[in-house]
Amino acid sequence: MESEKKEENAPNNEAAPTLKTKEDNMAKINNSIKENNGIKEFDLLFLIDATGSMGDYIRAAKEESENISTKLRTSYPEYNFQYGYVFYRDPIDSKSDIHEVINLTDNVNSLPEKIGKIKAQGGGDLPEDWVGAFKLANESISWRNGIKSIMHLADAGAHGKEFTLSDKYPEESAKLKDELMKCAKKNIKIFGYIIAEDARNSFNKCQELYKSYGGSYEICEFPKKEKKRYARREYKAESIDDEECCCDEDMDCNEREECYGDKDEDEDEDEEDDLNERFRDRVLDNVESML
């Protein structure tokens, strides 16, 4: 009798399930239910350079997140879409820089607020930390077994001697190759959005490597629309002679209101709308090409 009591009071050496374990188990159950109901899975990860020059694209990602989700959900009800974000900077060269991750989720209503907290800032030299970005995509994102895609937006290339013309960190090349190979093994299709020429060489090299690893990689031209210049053919006031104007033909002028009249106050808003629309349409086209 005494031995039975000892057994009852003996400590349980099995570790209590952690919150992460419970969440993983629940995810497996939910995925099993979806499979039995014929629901297909599509995981879409945005990999976005979040250094100082990329504010317009972060804003577009925030403002179009729900529009993209609504369109895909209504057009393809047989799919369960999840969306995630990796916002990367350049801690390799600027030690105060950090990367920020929003894991895959189908709770799209929460995305605008989360993305709205991301600030375009940082960046040291011209190349950025593509290695860190893809490492997070491989290690910090909860990919499912369905269709997987990365949409990578950048206006600057990667560190590493094979990816940029001049760099202080040539050893990054081997690291980036390793991360790309891991993505290819996961069967992730990558779309590379070239925003500026500075990034072209890196995107081209990544595409070449990724295809050699058996992966699918498509390059998309996605330049930022240039702002209108205050040339006299557009804004010149009729009462001012060419000789008296303070600006040359194709020169921006701090005194343009005196020379050319005021800028259309709706112009900035129109440019934002144009970028949002192009971003939304390009993402939808890329996703639909995989369905």
Predicted regions and their residues:
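Divalent cation-coordinating acidic motifs and surrounding scaffolds
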Residues: 2-8, 14-248, 258-260, 264, ...
